[in-house]
Amino acid sequence: MLELRLVQGGLLKKVLESIKDLVNDANFDCSASGFSLQAMDSSHVALVAVLLRSEGFEHYRCDRNISMGMNLGNMAKMLRCAGNDDIVTMKADDDGDVITFMFESPTQDKISDFEMKLMDIDSEHLGIPESEYEAIVRMPSAEFARICKDLSTIGDTVVISVTKEGVKFSTRGDIGTANIVCRQNTSVDKPEDATIIEMQETVSLTFALRYMNSFTKATPLANQVTISLSSELPVVVEYKIAEMGYIRYYLAPKIEEEDEAANYAQPAQNSAAAATSNNGTKKNEGNNKVDSKKRAIKSEFVDDSEAATDAQPQAKAKTKTEAGEDDDVEVMDTKPKNEPDDGDEVMETKPKTESNGEVEVMDIE
């Protein structure tokens, strides 16, 4: 039996509103420690992790671990029927196929209940390793949201650079360029208004603004946002939900064309077979370049070790062995569920090869 009673019903509404446009269907996992969700978007570029600890609920009963598949859009519709001050109670049987939402007004003069059918969603929990980041920026969440919104009127990508001078957000578009610099500022009346920068090394990464703007929908949940950056890892954008938990967004960086061409030059030279067509002629050199609008997910994004892979297989991005001379090459099938629009950015996934302990990526037609 599962029974959760949350006095701050409006908080659950805000959580759903902040993730429903990124993920359509997901499993909510309930255990003795709390109520959680982890899911990737359909393009396998972003991942969202939500945790609401059991201590934050007025009443929390979970007899055994249970996973409930839900359509987040439908769940958000039901929660919109609750007032911001209503008390929300969720109930589900261990082997049931529905979940019940009950909304009570603060004066308890109005009680509503809604039933929603659960879904059977085939997904697996991904391993996210604990990592040390080269730079961590803490700043007001409203300011970060405003920066992302303003830059999206100029371009469709943002370059986040952290140096001794501060953190710079830059973009470039058809009409021009924009640069916004935020310097460390701790001389404020309220701690949540401070901008704090912790830097081990300078870092500069490029991200899609449409994802960043989607992340900022969690702004009503927290006064501050924490942005963790490292050149070899996806960015982490975290909003703490008071003392109750958090929402964390992980986003793979975009790979610029000039960097990609340099990184792939050596592997291409060492793999003549990958650089020749079926008739033995070499492909055009331009084919080895990667479009700057395409992304690649780093290996750290979906798994923390080979052992974790055995215990927790990757979700959605299932692998298949390429039939050919080299049976060790694996190709990730990350085709989105729906065909992208003309303006959408499509991720191009590439096989990985080991070289001196580092993972290198190379283009294979």
From Swiss-Prot:
Cellular location(s): Nucleus
Gene3D superfamilies: 3.70.10.10
Pfam family, one: PCNA_C
GO CC terms, sorted: PCNA complex
Cell cycle keyword on record: no
DNA-binding annotation, residue ranges on this chain: 61-80
GO biological process: leading strand elongation; mismatch repair; regulation of DNA replication; translesion synthesis
Biased composition (Basic and acidic residues): 282-301
UniProt main location, coarse: nucleus
An annotated Gene Ontology molecular function: DNA binding
Region (Disordered): 262-365
Extent of Low complexity compositional bias: 262-281
Domain of life of the native organism: Eukaryota
Keywords: DNA replication, DNA-binding, Nucleus
InterPro entries (alphabetical): DNA_clamp_sf, Pr_cel_nuc_antig, Pr_cel_nuc_antig_C, Pr_cel_nuc_antig_CS, Pr_cel_nuc_antig_N
HAMAP family: DNApol_clamp_arch (MF_00317)
Family: Belongs to the PCNA family.
Function field: This protein is an auxiliary protein of DNA polymerase delta and may be involved in DNA replication as its carrot homolog, typical PCNA. The larger PCNA is perhaps processed thus bestowing on it exactly the same function as its homolog.
Name of the featured protein: Proliferating cell nuclear antigen large form
Organism: Daucus carota
